[in-house]
Amino acid sequence: MKNIVCFGEVLWDVFPTHKKIGGAPLNFAIRLKSLNNNVSIISRIGKDKLGKKGVFFIVDKGINTESLQIDDTLQTGKVKVALDLDGQATYDIQYPRAWDNIQLTEASKQATLDADAFVYGSLAARDSTTKHTLYELLKIAKNKIFDVNLRPPYYDIDIVKDLMDEADFIKFNDDEIDMVCADMQFDKQSLEDKIKYIAEQTNTKSICVTKGDKGAILYYYDEFYYNEGYPIQVIDTVGAGDSFLATLINKLLNNDNPQEAIDFACAIGAIVAGSEGANPKITVEDITNFIESNS
């Protein structure tokens, strides 16, 4: 069992027919908690109805809320989600929202100091206030895990580079690593070459790239590990990458075999993509059975 802090946006995904609470940091937190970790969230929500519902939901999941801040004026985060015929999601992220105003507090500093790992993403750095808080916490964090989350127009390549330089572990999807390498004027086509280039430029020992239904590549202390993906009927992809990363990090923090780690992570990502919503209940037994049935 590890102490893990997740930093960034808490928001509501608004689908055409319903709303679900989410945001990558909260999705990480929920999955990490389900894997028997102690998890804290550093974020900010509004005093509105969605904020109140969010607090009840987060507390019910057993996540520590001592660093969950309440904003007097800004509303709780909201994202309009559209799904195409293949279940692939596109997002309209509203701005400004409460999570753009995360303050540096004693509670957030203490939670970060006490944590075995600190998970953060690039989307939270879209506003100067939350970006400043993130940069300050990264100065004192251990095992810094960076989820690259490029949502135009809310990213700046220079900020992404800063956040990569701070990271001990970086996770991209295949489109994101292509975009970052293009911005860094690295034009080799091999995914392995791109991963090694990022590792050299940032002095990061561990990088993972997800490839949708084609699995993922893990670069872990100079070795590559591969999973080619699992067949699944996609319902929606919201949260699949978040559960993937949470499961992968959980395995690696506990010194499990890297190949087993990426196999488990790809399996849970597939199961989530084949389910409705970002945080379906999934047990370790469910993952093991899924892998065995597809081996």
Q: Which role does the model predict for each range below?
A:
Residues 4, 25, 29, 51, ...:
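A general structural signal for well-ordered alpha-helical segments in protein cores
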Residues 4, 14-79, 83-88, 93-99, ...:
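Substrate-binding N-lobe of the ribokinase-like
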Residues 8:
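Active-site beta-alpha turn of Rossmann-fold NAD(P)-dependent dehydrogenases/reductases
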Residues 3, 188-295:
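Conserved phosphate-binding/catalytic region of the ribokinase-like
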Residues 12, 47, 150-152, 176, ...:
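Short, glycine/acidic-enriched loop or turn micro-motifs at the edges of active sites
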Residues 32, 173, 241:
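Short, conserved phosphate/pyrophosphate- and ester-handling motifs at nucleotide-, phospho-/glycolipid
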Residues 2-5, 57-60, 65-68, 85-224, ...:
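Ribokinase/PfkB-type carbohydrate-kinase core domain
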Residues 16-23, 49, 75, 154, ...:
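Residues at secondary-structure transition points
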